[in-house]
Structures are given as structure tokens and as C-alpha cells.
Amino acid sequence: MANIKSQKKRILTNEKARLRNNSYKSELKTLIRKVDAAVESGNKDAAAETLRTASRKLDKAVSKGVLHKNTAANKKSGLAKKVAKI
């Protein structure tokens, strides 16, 4: 455990951020699974709609600092390729 007051505060804020980021990442994974499920079912409209939602959330995660911009770009392009194959 840290002895310095500011470091004790940083430990608390880091824990809050970690929990927030984990819940956000979990939501992203769920959206990505929904896109994959829509692609598997062959429903192009549903796949396109869920892809749009997932892309927005991925961009938001980048702006909030949850994901690196290249990670989000790779995920978005991979999902777009899957949807385009339908």
C-alpha cells in the first residue's frame, strides 16, 4: 500500500477507471457478438444496423481512452468485411 496521500488517491481513481473501462469493453464485446450473430443469420439489414451501432460505440471508446484508435479501426474494418460478404 502506498504511503503518499496522492498515490493513495491515484489507487482509488485507477480502480474506478478500471471498473468503468471493463464494463465499457464488455458492452463492446456484446455488440461485436451481435454483429457476428446477424452475419451468421444472413440478415443484411440487421447486420448493417448493428455494425453502425458497434462502430459508433468503438469510436466513443477511443474518444474516452478505453481503446487505442488502431484497435478500434481494426475491429471496425473486420466487422465491415464480414457484413460486406453477406
From Swiss-Prot:
Xref: InterPro entries: Ribosomal_bS20, Ribosomal_bS20_sf
PANTHER family for this protein: 30S RIBOSOMAL PROTEIN S20, SMALL RIBOSOMAL SUBUNIT PROTEIN BS20C
Family: Belongs to the bacterial ribosomal protein bS20 family.
Protein name (database record): Small ribosomal subunit protein bS20
GO biological process terms on file: translation
Function of the protein: Binds directly to 16S ribosomal RNA.
Source species, domain of life: Bacteria
Keyword list, A-Z: Ribonucleoprotein, Ribosomal protein, RNA-binding, rRNA-binding
GO MF annotations in UniProt: small ribosomal subunit rRNA binding; structural constituent of ribosome
Protein's organism: Kocuria rhizophila (strain ATCC 9341 / DSM 348 / NBRC 103217 / DC2201)
A Gene Ontology term for the protein's cellular component: cytosol
